[in-house]
Amino acid sequence: MREKWKALTKRERRLFAAAFVFLASAVLLRFVPGLRFSALLCLCATAVLFIFYLLEHFARRGYRAAAWCELALIAVLLLGFSLFTVLETMVVRGSFADESDEPVSAVIVLGAGVNGETPSLTLRTRIDAAAAYLEEHPNVPVVLSGGQGPGEAITEAECMRRALVRRGVDESRLYPEERSTSTQENLRYSRAILEELGVDPARRVAIVTSDFHLCRARLMWGGDIAAVPAHLPSALYFQCLTVNYFIREAFGLAAYFVYGG
């Protein structure tokens, strides 16, 4: 097997490696739902490598247009990688907890997926982070924000309410917001609830969400917030999920800057 590999040319080895990455990505895409975004990126990278192979093939045959296209593709990739680096840096820098002791006027917990009536892994981590924070801040109102999507028997807000009440949080503090279907709506409708409660949204509020999601939530809120990050467990698989989510969030941040939502 090793002799056959050595007998291959560099171009043949690259094609073989690209085919291997393609197959591995297809397996991840099919059998590991949590890593689908990273698998899609790998598939895209494989496609780009194949395009490079074709352009190089035609460029060596004297097609000048292929050579120019190859240079243009390199320039686009360098620009895209530079933009990704900037966005990813923002996501990472915005993922840390707020260390200030300044009091907050309210807490907003952002929802995530619900499987039937059971919180997803991401939502469980947000509930855990919220429960710990509310124990330390027992006198502030809490808005639980999240509507109902496909496959969800109850709203995300109701799922969070049930879980927090089971953990001993006073139900009278909890104000479900059950209309939202996006982060932007989460914050818009939560702001309206705070105003109804007589809480000035311009005052400092705490926002509980996943660590990778904090940067975008902070930008969308626009005011002074106490960031309360929810983290996935430290096991290797969950850390792979974390990397996947942080990479995906850079694209979500790009969409926010382009579309404003």
Predicted regions and their residues:
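Cytoplasmic membrane-interface regions of multi-pass membrane proteins
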Residues: 3, 56-63
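Membrane-embedded alpha-helical segments of integral membrane proteins
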Residues: 11-58
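Short hydrophobic alpha-helical membrane-anchoring segments
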Residues: 26-30, 80-88, 257, 261
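Internal/C-terminal transmembrane anchor helices
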Residues: 66-89
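A structural signal for short, hydrophobic/glycine-enriched beta-strand patches
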Residues: 85-247
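A transmembrane-helix-recognition feature enriched in membrane-embedded lipid enzymes
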Residues: 239-261
